[in-house]
């Protein structure tokens, strides 16, 4: 497999970056728009166009929904219109790829159709947890063949709904996937979580917020219990925020180089973990300045390790681990609350430990996280495991460690198209970099 020579710099990085739309918001908006088609057409502005979101678009099109990107305004396909009807053709098949949102959000939608819909995905996706969602749907009266990919949902035109108990300790997406479709169920839906702490809980809060924006009545007043009242989901316009988790690798460049990086379009109020990101960057010794529509981070000349619980923001763990490995030599970082990362695109805890140690770092796995001791590292191959966040973590390490070769950098297209070009532009000192905008050689059909 080909490798990408990660650019290095011995000088502070100074750049302004615009990251594309939030994957989490884009795919939730697409699902809600598809469920709202009986009420009319919806529009989405600022949508992310990446492998994950294109898989969601294809999945909904496979269910008969019309998703169009007129691209008459130079938006590069980020302005979408959703219309049509939930009416899949006989024998419909959905490719989930490696997208957890497609795997967990679309089966409840398919259950509302009158056809049997088969789901499959990448080989690695077959190892991702899905049983709690399928068991929950069965408890609600949905007929499903199979207990993991590939599986088939036998739609009967409606879902009874009611109360269902699930263990969502493996993924908050089990809860979100059910809630998104719950208002379309005959009796509505009550989801009760019965297991250990739910990881990435802010993503459930995002789901609840967007449901309310679509006119759905949601009661989340009791811990580990969510009630969605039956009723129409409104067709409306959705404005997608920039993806703040995708901004973190660029902000990390400021942290580890002592430079200054500004991200434009940073929301003042957000359902994404904006406050947590600011707290993390501050704990790493950086100065954080937030304006009306931007965030600017100025890194310190050096910084120490941190002790942090990342349960709610596990997607940031690879970037945080990379920054921890590059802290002041001898300083120790403890990343806690992320045992669930063993069930993501890859076992991220094992992968991070293996790759940091391969390049001379010191990283040990614990029951629920990592202990990283910063030490001098050397170049070598950084394996990405077909995981977009592992690939960007390798780029962060390579910024300070010459000779790092990142395997399969193309996997970053899962959520951040054109990452290699954007990274190079940032290091070249260019400003107003537009993530997701056309570059020479970009595959426009992605």
Curated annotation (Swiss-Prot):
It catalyses: 3-phosphoshikimate + phosphoenolpyruvate = 5-O-(1-carboxyvinyl)-3-phosphoshikimate + phosphate. Pfam families: EPSP_synthase (PF00275). NCBIfam families: aroA. GO terms for cellular component: cytoplasm. The gene is aroA. The keyword Amino-acid biosynthesis applies. GO terms for molecular function: 3-phosphoshikimate 1-carboxyvinyltransferase activity. Monomer. Residues 1-20 are annotated as: Disordered. This is 3-phosphoshikimate 1-carboxyvinyltransferase. Keywords: Amino-acid biosynthesis, Aromatic amino acid biosynthesis, Cytoplasm, Transferase. The active site is at 315 (proton acceptor). The keyword DNA-binding does not apply. 3-phosphoshikimate binds at residues 23-24, 28, 171-173, 200, 315, 344. Its EC number is 2.5.1.19. Belongs to the EPSP synthase family. The lineage of its organism: Bacteria, Bacillati, Actinomycetota, Actinomycetes, Mycobacteriales. It comes from Mycolicibacterium vanbaalenii (strain DSM 7251 / JCM 13017 / BCRC 16820 / KCTC 9966 / NRRL B-24157 / PYR-1). Phosphoenolpyruvate binds at residues 23, 100, 128, 173, 348, 389, 414. Catalyzes the transfer of the enolpyruvyl moiety of phosphoenolpyruvate (PEP) to the 5-hydroxyl of shikimate-3-phosphate (S3P) to produce enolpyruvyl shikimate-3-phosphate and inorganic phosphate. Pathway: Metabolic intermediate biosynthesis; chorismate biosynthesis; chorismate from D-erythrose 4-phosphate and phosphoenolpyruvate: step 6/7.
